[in-house]
Amino acid sequence: MQTKLSVALAAALAGFALGAQAANVEVYGLVDTGLNYQHVDADRSGVDDISRFQMKSSQSTPNRWGLRGTEDIGPGLKMGFLLESQFGSDDGSLTGNRLFQRAAQIMLMSDDYGTLVLGRSGMLRSGHGTTGLWGGNIAPFSNSWGDYMVGSKYVMPGGFAPGDNTITYQSPVMSGLQVHLQYSNQLDAVGADDWEEEGKNSTDRQWAVGATYTSGPVHVVAVLDSVLYGRTDETGGYDPDDSLSFSLGATYDFGFMKLYASGMYFSDMLAREFQSHNDMDSMLGGEGVSYKGYSLQLGTTVPAWGGTVKANLGWMDASVDHEYLASDVYEYGDTDRIGFSLGYVYPLSKMAEVYVGAGVTKDSANATLRADDSSADPIAYEVLSGLLVRF
């Protein structure tokens, strides 16, 4: 597999090198590697606390390299492309076993009519590619730092990834307002089972409508999205209700500090849409269950000592919405999650920076195991530091 990927990569680079004079083509990327300490108390009888010290990559920002380019094809009209890969710099692994895991998209851009994007693209409620609206635009730690430093994806379920077979339309910017429309005909074609068919109700699809508004120090993002779930083993073969979520976020730059605030309402979110911490043994990994609830985040960045201080507080309340499997085996339950993160980034040069951070995440789970009722309050602590280089 790796040999095939290497051959494909070499061919792609050779092709782009030959065409570089005809279009504006750029190679770019970043490498983020550091050290990490975690302590996890699962608050479960018979489950030992876990303490570990390890090297990790992509702690503050996911590692990547990519190719992007544009070409003028007429008055006010351009064609463009974006190919973006993600990898582990601690072990050299390829994320998700995909050559271009983060983005593989082609774009038609018109000054008058907006932009059309086709291919594997960031969902609107993500920070991926040219189509993601969330990420670092709306939270100081983007999706997260490390494993337990709370960012959006650990308190807001679903949507923080690219999707396959995606079409996105971005309107022209009008008085600071831009509209975004998106539809994925099959969210994960690579991981799909043989019986899943693109565009059919046998596979997961997704639609989203978003809007952004920017005026001076104010930036606002709103996204309404829904996963059209296919029939899965997770729901015993039943066709689960489609999820629905509404997310709203805003930032305000005061100059001496930048304030971030965001919130989300969600319903019918299957358990797999939650980025739960397995070591914490929270109940959000329960099978055959969907959830509804709310999430809130409040954060800030402050220039200090030549760098930037970051802080973020996140909270989520998720309660069982629907139960699709009646079994004595599966464990699930309502869960509250709260987390706090504090970090500092210091630039060493135009390309390099050093960062440090610490965070704590705590779940309060009222679990239901049909043979027994129980609850748990797992908690995790994390301290990390690393170096990041852009090119």
Residue ranges with predicted function:
Residues A208-L342:
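Detector for outer-membrane/organellar transmembrane beta-barrel domains
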Residues T61-W65, R102-I106, G163-I167, R205-V209, ...:
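Hydrophobic, lipid-facing positions within transmembrane beta-strands of outer-membrane proteins
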Residues L77-M79, D112-L116, G176-V179, P217-A222, ...:
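Repeated loop/turn-to-beta-strand initiation elements of outer-membrane beta-barrel proteins
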Residues A23-Y37, R52-D188, T203, T212-H219:
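Outer membrane beta-barrel
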